[in-house]
Swiss-Prot record:
EC number(s) stated in the UniProt entry for this protein: 2.7.6.1
Underlying gene: prs
Lineage start: Bacteria, Pseudomonadati, Pseudomonadota, Betaproteobacteria, Burkholderiales
Reaction(s) catalysed (UniProt annotation): D-ribose 5-phosphate + ATP = 5-phospho-alpha-D-ribose 1-diphosphate + AMP + H(+)
Entry protein name: Ribose-phosphate pyrophosphokinase
GO MF term set: ATP binding; kinase activity; magnesium ion binding; ribose phosphate diphosphokinase activity
Task of the protein: Involved in the biosynthesis of the central metabolite phospho-alpha-D-ribosyl-1-pyrophosphate (PRPP) via the transfer of pyrophosphoryl group from ATP to 1-hydroxyl of ribose-5-phosphate (Rib-5-P).
Cofactors that this protein relies on: Mg(2+)
Family, as annotated: Belongs to the ribose-phosphate pyrophosphokinase family. Class I subfamily.
GO-annotated cellular components: cytoplasm; ribose phosphate diphosphokinase complex
Stored Pfam families: Pribosyl_synth, Pribosyltran_N
Protein source organism: Bordetella pertussis (strain Tohama I / ATCC BAA-589 / NCTC 13251)
Amino acid sequence: MIFTGTANTRLAVDVVNHLDMSLGKMTVGRYSDGEVMVEINENVRGKDVFVLQPTCAPTNDNLMEIMVMVDALRRASAGRITAAIPYFGYARQDRRPRSARVAISAKVVANMLQVAGVDRVLTMDLHADQIQGFFDIPVDNIYAGPILLGDIWRRNFSNLVVVSPDIGGVVRARALAKQLEADLAIIDKRRPRANVSEVMNIIGEVDGRTCIIMDDMVDTAGTLCKAAQALKDRGAGAVYAYCTHPVLSGGAIERIETSSLDELVVTDTIPLSEQAQACGKIRQLSCAALLGETILRISNAESVSSLFAD
């Protein structure tokens, strides 16, 4: 059984349509002061239940929704509850810098999910793989790579080079470059403060080539747009960005529209705003089939990793 909240109903509908089933019957509402109210409207006793809900903006509202949904299902005696969170909010707060008195919010969210009654977590392209270790329950972190890679292959680009937007993304970019039999370039940047970045140097040859920037998410798009400009300044013929999660906060849309990017390709882990849908440089791919197949395999106790075998 698959239930969903209000964060990304369209994706949930696409997933159940792929599986030729219907969404679970549940009412999600708000009291006058904004508190979340959830009621399960069918029998779930002993059932294998999935709650599909990304914790995108409004992050705290959507996070609280999933907590209350899970609690309602647990109290209704669901047999097993899997939190399917395609976009895992708070994932960027995954460690404590040496001199900062800050929370490790990704761990806080992991604790909350487990206390609420989640038995298993399914997510896509976690910002930091080590977040899986914050849980004492199984976590399936699947990858949008097959979706993005398939789109690149269909477009039959020539003279490709895969670009990592920072040192931390090298592993992801290298894996894509290997599958495409393409070269790899790296953008060396320094980030003076949160959501502000400065492109410093490009490691690799991009002159006259088609550049594919690969990243797990695009937020304010500051890094992405500066990277595209730096690549064009170094002679790149075209710059395309492939990012799993379209957070697109702040002035991201305006930056993308006026940037040197030729196109930004994202998935539907997060629904696009009307402004983003109207942007001619943004194109969205569906991850419903991949999520649906993963949910089916988890429910049937089949291998998930074989979906991503080279």
